[in-house]
Amino acid sequence: MLVTITCFGLNQACIKNHVVILNLLAPGRILEYHCYSNVDDLGVKRLDFNATPFTIKFHDEIPNLTKWNCILRQGPNNSMEYSYDVEVYKAGPRLIPRCGQLRAWAARIDGIYFARKYNTPLKRVLFWNK
């Protein structure tokens, strides 16, 4: 009798999760963002209107809580007077990681929009703080 065993590490067969940040504010309006997790800080960056979206790709931290936040800022004449600290991804403590999750966040003049799936409309979920 022949027994074959295949062993994968926790993340080898798991497609990375994606957090996508889009700037849909207005021509000339810059979105400033600072994204960080419990294990990584990506620093402060800027995204031009309709530029290629910024994407964070990651695996869930097992068995710890995986959480990503992004502080989004914008304003007329790049004043950055409007902001929101958004919890853009959260997976509770677990033994089996979430795989291939999408969290899309879009900054628009009237608020912050969200979608969990590709090819679904973004819906406003937050209003800017001043």
From Swiss-Prot:
A single GO BP: rejection of self pollen
Pfam families for this protein: Self-incomp_S1 (PF05938)
Keyword Zinc set for record: no
PANTHER family named in the record: F11M15.10 PROTEIN-RELATED (PTHR31232:SF161), PTHR31232
Family per similarity comment: Belongs to the plant self-incompatibility (S1) protein family.
GO cellular component terms, semicolon-separated: extracellular region
Protein name: S-protein homolog 30
Top-level taxon in the UniProt lineage: Eukaryota
Primary site of residence: secreted
Record InterPro entries: Self-incomp_S1
Cell compartment(s), UniProt: Secreted
Keywords, ordered alphabetically: Glycoprotein, Secreted, Self-incompatibility, Signal
Sugar attachment sites: 64, 77
